[in-house]
């Protein structure tokens, strides 16, 4: 048995060499830091080290739960993620369906490439472009509003606009890249089904609702489960570049709070406790969504 395993490894050694950097990256940057979660239960001192720092149990968690920012962070994180789920999740599916209907191969490739480009542009550049468009004095959007007789709006300084602006920016950046997996799913739908539907007199909408959407349903369900697992997770990079103290009321989320408390205020134990709480909530949502999908359907992650 041992020799058989070694023989298989030797036979596929080039594949193992190719995947080794990815495995090492995950071990070093994703799994190894998990050992540092113990500082969430300690009064961590950088000079004393993890082992010698005093153990304080759940004190950091209780401090967070009693914080004046707790409910604001929960509300903002949930609402921004929820809006992203409602408006952002269907966007790549719709775009993939539109791409799938394009008959001109060259035009299809060009439009797909254009839609993928924002994903590869630096977040700093993306937010910089967005800020320029929304600038109150020289921004394109405000110039259009002014030309139509309206008053210029300070979009990035008004709390009521922040969540909508973030969701719009996130959709614009990720919709093209997100459509790739749905295009792959669409390519696996059997063409014979469409031909049979046409023979039976079925039009576009009938093909869409009876063939196309059911054909990609397993992929949609898997992606939805993963998205629900991220319902309490909002990337801090874009928000940090977009928000200011004037928009904390609607834009401050758990990840940005962890960044400020941990890296700026150097309160590592408290920020670790907050991050751990967020991870537990995300894992719980993922398990619940997967269990519901497994109970009522045939598609699940495990």
Model-assigned labels for residue ranges:
Residues 7-302:
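A structural signal for multi-pass alpha-helical bundles of membrane permease subunits
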Residues 1-2:
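N-terminal hydrophobic targeting signals that begin at the initiator methionine
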